[in-house]
A protein has these predicted regions:
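Low-complexity, acidic/polar, glycine-enriched regions of mature
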Residues: 31-191
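Bacterial N-terminal signal peptides
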Residues: 18-28
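Bacterial N-terminal signal peptides that target proteins for export
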Residues: 6-19
Length: 191
C-alpha cells in the first residue's frame, strides 16, 4: 500500500511538472519583444496656453515592450524618460519647465497594467509617474503588424494638477492649461 501511494505521488508530481514545463514552453513560444526604433517613434505632449498652444517632443526615452506575437497583446510595457529631453522648440520655456518640475534632473515613467476591448476599441491601463507622484491612467490605443514591423499609436489625456504640480503662470496673466494631451507613435521590430 505504501509503495502504491508513493508511486501515485511521484506520478502526480511528474505529471504536474511536465504540464508546467509544457505550459511555460507554449507561453514563451508566443511571447516576443519589440525593439523600438527611436528614429521612427515619437512621444509628444500638446499644451494650451493663454493665446496660443505648443507641443513638446521627447528627444530620447527608454522603452521595453513584450507581448504575444499572435495577438499583439502586450504583457509588459516600461517607458522611461528625463524631462530634460522634452523639447518645445523654445529654449527659455524648456528651462522654465525644468524649474516648474522642481529643478535637478526630473524623470518620468509609465508601467503597463492591463488591456481590454470595449465596443471595438482597445484600451490600455498603466501607472504614470511624474514629479514623484504615481497615477493610474487609461487610454485607447491601436497596434498594427506588417511583417515584423509593429506600430503602436495612442493618446492619453492628463491633468498636471494630478501630479502635485502648480499652475504654470507667466507675466501674471498667462497660464498653461493643466489639461494636457500625450500622444505616442512607437515603431519597432518584433523579435
Amino acid at each position: 500500500m505504501f509503495v502504491q501511494v508513493l508511486l501515485r505521488n511521484i506520478m502526480n508530481r511528474t505529471t504536474r511538472t511536465a504540464a508546467c514545463c509544457l505550459l511555460a514552453l507554449i507561453t514563451s513560444a508566443a511571447a516576443g519583444t519589440l525593439a523600438i526604433d527611436k528614429g521612427k517613434s515619437q512621444i509628444k505632449v500638446d499644451a494650451k496656453a493663454t493665446g496660443h498652444s505648443f507641443a513638446g517632443t521627447l528627444s530620447d526615452f527608454t522603452a521595453k515592450v513584450t507581448g504575444d506575437d499572435a495577438t499583439m497583446a502586450p504583457t509588459a510595457v516600461d517607458l522611461g524618460w528625463k524631462f530634460a529631453d522634452l523639447k518645445t522648440a523654445d529654449e527659455k520655456r524648456d528651462k522654465e519647465m525644468m524649474k516648474w518640475l522642481g529643478g535637478g534632473n526630473p524623470e518620468g515613467s509609465f508601467k503597463f497594467i492591463k488591456i481590454w476591448t470595449d465596443k471595438g476599441q482597445t484600451y490600455a491601463q498603466g501607472t504614470l509617474k511624474i514629479h514623484g507622484v504615481s497615477k493610474t491612467i487609461d487610454f485607447p490605443y491601436t497596434a498594427k503588424k506588417d511583417g515584423k514591423t509593429v506600430t503602436i499609436d495612442g493618446t492619453a489625456a492628463l491633468d498636471y494638477y494630478d501630479f502635485g504640480l502648480p499652475l504654470i503662470r507667466a507675466m501674471a496673466v498667462m497660464t498653461v492649461n493643466p489639461k494636457l494631451t500625450v500622444s505616442f507613435h512607437l515603431v519597432g521590430e518584433a523579435n
